[in-house]
Regions:
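A short beta-strand signature within small-molecule sensing/ligand-binding domains used
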Residues: 140, 149-163, 228-231, 237-247, ...
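Short beta-strand edge/capping elements of PAS-family sensory modules
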Residues: 170-171, 255-258
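Extreme N-terminal signal-anchor transmembrane helix of membrane signaling/transducer proteins, especially
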Residues: 4-32, 279-288
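N-terminal alpha-helical signal peptides/signal-anchor transmembrane segments
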Residues: 45-66, 70-79
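Membrane-interface helix-start motif
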Residues: 186, 244, 258-281
Length: 289
């Protein structure tokens, strides 16, 4: 009788030890894999930001060249010599169609807006006039403009009378390209991540779900200055993401950021299956023993 109790105690002890080893193994494997996945996602985020910068640089070179070619056309120069807003506004429609941009602005040498072509009716000459001095007074030729819920990347080009070397400015040409849902999806594919453009307290465009956009506004800082997440974990709509951000220069404030995010939960979803497999193996080993 005593031998049976001893064997029973021994068996229970073996079961307890095996179970403890199994669960310890599960925890160690899970933490190790999670850490490796985290490091992999952080590297992917860095690569995604690099891919965005390369894509954006090539895009900006192309669009800046388009603005320079358009500003150098003889008919554009001749148009600006009229100094007549009605004439310039009428003729600018053909230029806008030729440029293929989402926005076109012409201003005289004093910075007065003479023509504006864009689709949203809420973007008026008055709003363009408020924005334009910030652009023309800057040394940069590329800017971001958030107006009435629309975000544009704009390119400024001088219109010269005669050769550019003469530096006799007739006026200015501004071409704008909107960051819409299509552009956000394209950037998401290039970065192989979710993306979100945030301007102050507004998510302008993103590939996130609406609930996740609201959470991003709540948990993420307004700007990367001063130590924003660079591959840190944030929760959006009950899902864990690793995120980083890129500052995009805008005249004045608030700040404009591009957020790049990868789902940590999706990347570690396989761990549930792995845990079940290890648990089954552990129980099999216990029963076989």
């Amino acid at each position: 009788m005593g031998g049976i109790r001893l064997r029973t105690k021994f068996l229970f002890s073996m079961v307890a030890v095996s179970a403890a080893l199994t669960f310890t193994t599960l925890l160690v494997v899970r933490r190790t894999v999670q850490q490796e996945v985290r490091l992999g996602i952080q590297r992917d985020l860095q690569n995604s930001v690099s891919a965005f910068r390369n894509f954006q640089k090539q895009r900006e070179v192309t669009l800046e060249r388009s603005a320079a070619l358009l500003a150098d056309l003889p008919n554009v120069r001749a148009l600006m010599t009229t100094h007549d807003p009605a004439t310039i506004q009428d003729a600018s429609r053909d230029l806008w169609q030729l440029a293929g941009s989402d926005l076109l602005l012409l201003a005289d040498s004093s910075g007065k807006v003479m023509a504006l072509q864009t689709t949203p009716p809420e973007i008026t000459v008055h709003k363009a006039q408020d924005f334009f001095p910030q652009v023309v007074s800057s040394d940069e030729t590329r800017h971001w403009w958030y107006v009435e819920g629309h975000l544009y990347e704009v390119f400024l080009q001088d219109i010269y009378f005669g050769p550019a070397s003469g530096r006799q400015v007739l006026g200015y040409l501004l071409l704008g390209y909107e960051i819409d849902d299509r552009v956000a999806r394209d950037l998401s594919r290039v970065a192989a991540s979710e993306v979100a453009f945030r301007y102050g307290d507004v998510i302008v465009r993103s590939t996130l779900k609406p609930a996740q956009e609201s959470e991003l506004l709540r948990v993420a800082p307004r700007t990367t200055a001063g130590g924003s997440p660079q591959g840190d974990q944030i929760w959006l709509g009950g899902e864990r993401f690793l995120a980083t951000s890129v500052d995009l220069p805008t005249p004045g404030s608030p700040a404009l950021n591009l957020w790049v995010l990868k789902s940590f939960d999706q990347a570690t979803a396989f761990l549930s299956s792995l845990n079940e497999l290890l648990l089954a193996l552990g129980l099999t080993a216990v029963l076989a023993g």
